[in-house]
Amino acid sequence: MTYLDTDKQTYADLSITETANNEQFLFSLFSRTETKEGKSLMMNWIMYPLSDLDMIRKRQEAVAWDALPELLLNEEELDFIEYYLAYRDQIREAHVLLSCATVIDRLLRYDSTRYVICRGVKLVIHLLHCLERWAKELDEDAPQLMKESARMVNDILSGSELGEVLEQTSGEERRLSNYTIDKYDYLFRCTRLLSLKELLSVLYLLDVCRTAHRVAKEKNFCCTPKVVETMDFSVEGVVHPFVK
């Protein structure tokens, strides 16, 4: 993607992220995302405007779409997944004998690290199934940006061990053995960590589009202003959202 060069004075003049008199700034309008990572992505969209005409139109189309789905997981679940994936304790390849040898110890003694691993693995499995369903059920008339995201989900799931996880946990509620949890944990936090980050980015994209759509409806903003390829244009009736 290509971006417009924007200096600090322009940000200040437009009151993008702060104002001299502690008045409302533009980002505050769009900061009510459902997730922390969604909020960071929204800030990125606002701070780094695109110069890529095709990508601008894709974003416009996605924000304007009235059929944007609910987020597939709630904020607490997504925060826990992020915490789990960033957790660096006890990352090791699974071994049947080691998994079996620690079963009794894990039953008798509470282990906070084991709790993070077990819940993290189960939430990631839930995430994979939710994304698989979303990608399969996406409407044919969905915006191009959503279609590209669904295609990325399908490519990642079908082209890696994550697809095998989906097949092996098709019931989702099936009880996982200690060895299976250890095996998936190494896969999620090591082997396929970057793939999972890419999958999570789809949810944050949905969050940003849903938030921008909601604000546009509430404030009667135009979601799809006309975009032209040249500098030969004029605009009338445009004001800063906080100009009274």
Map each language-model feature to its residues.
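Conserved NTPase motor "head" modules and their coupling/switch loops across ABC/AAA+ ATPases, GTPases
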Residues: 198-244
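An accessory alpha-helical subdomain
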Residues: 188-191
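Extended, charged coiled-coil "arm/hinge" scaffolds of SMC/Rad50-like chromosome-maintenance ATPases
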Residues: 158-185
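Conserved amphipathic alpha-helical "coupling/scaffold" segments
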Residues: 1-160, 202, 238
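Generic alpha-helical segment signature
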Residues: 56, 174-177, 199
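All-alpha helical catalytic cores of prenyl diphosphate-utilizing isoprenoid enzymes
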Residues: 124, 173-174, 234
